[in-house]
């Protein structure tokens, strides 16, 4: 995820945009923030919501950060969830006041390992499905390291997980499995 965010943020900065990146992490040390530090500058700010508290506290912290960032006048705000994230929390927050007046959801991009394991628990499959259900596109990470069979298996797993949560959507052309270095 961080590699993609770094590439995407660099692209937006080259376009002259003023951006904010919100790292949503549950770890004590946020490695992602350290990896993104070199993007910081006049047109890019990094913020973090750290975990270590209950779900209600985390939702309050997340919303508070989004409110503060909403007052900064960014052209784009990139929200990076932790590896396991309740996507409903994101959508719910953006539909509450005052965020509903400041933010418009643009691109929802889900990033999934091209070599996704087959043996997920029901809970993990639920989280996986919730993360891809509303995505405009699903980017497979490390696709250049995966075989055609592994990529096909990952695509089947995504659609099976969607079916398990009674989601009628099936992913096909929304899944991008090319090397990220080839993106323009």
Describe these PLM feature segments.
Residues 72, 76-171, 176:
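Phosphate/Mg2+-binding loops and adjacent switch elements
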Residues 2-121:
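Nucleotide-state-sensitive switch-loop elements of NTP-binding domains
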Residues 1-10, 174-184:
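P-loop NTP-binding site
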Residues 42-45, 51, 165-167, 174, ...:
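Generic structural motif recognizing short loop/turn segments at the entrances and edges of beta-strands
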């Amino acid at each position: 995820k961080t590699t993609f965010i770094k590439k995407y943020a660099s692209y937006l900065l080259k376009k002259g945009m003023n951006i904010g990146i919100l790292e949503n992490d549950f770890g004590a040390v946020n490695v992602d923030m350290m990896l993104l530090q070199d993007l910081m500058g006049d047109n890019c700010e990094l913020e973090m919501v750290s975990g270590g508290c209950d779900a209600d506290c985390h939702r309050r912290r997340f919303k508070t950060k989004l409110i503060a960032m909403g007052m900064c006048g960014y052209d784009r705000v990139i929200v990076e969830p932790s590896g396991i994230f309740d996507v409903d929390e994101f959508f719910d927050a953006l539909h509450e006041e005052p965020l509903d007046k400041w933010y418009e959801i643009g691109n929802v991009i889900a990033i999934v390992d091209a070599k996704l394991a087959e043996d997920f628990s029901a809970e993990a499959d639920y989280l996986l499905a919730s993360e891809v259900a509303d995505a405009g596109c699903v980017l497979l990470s490390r696709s250049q390291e995966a075989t055609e069979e592994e990529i096909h298996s990952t695509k089947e797993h995504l659609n099976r997980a969607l079916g398990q949560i009674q989601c009628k959507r099936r992913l096909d052309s929304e899944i991008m499995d090319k090397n990220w270095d080839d993106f323009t």
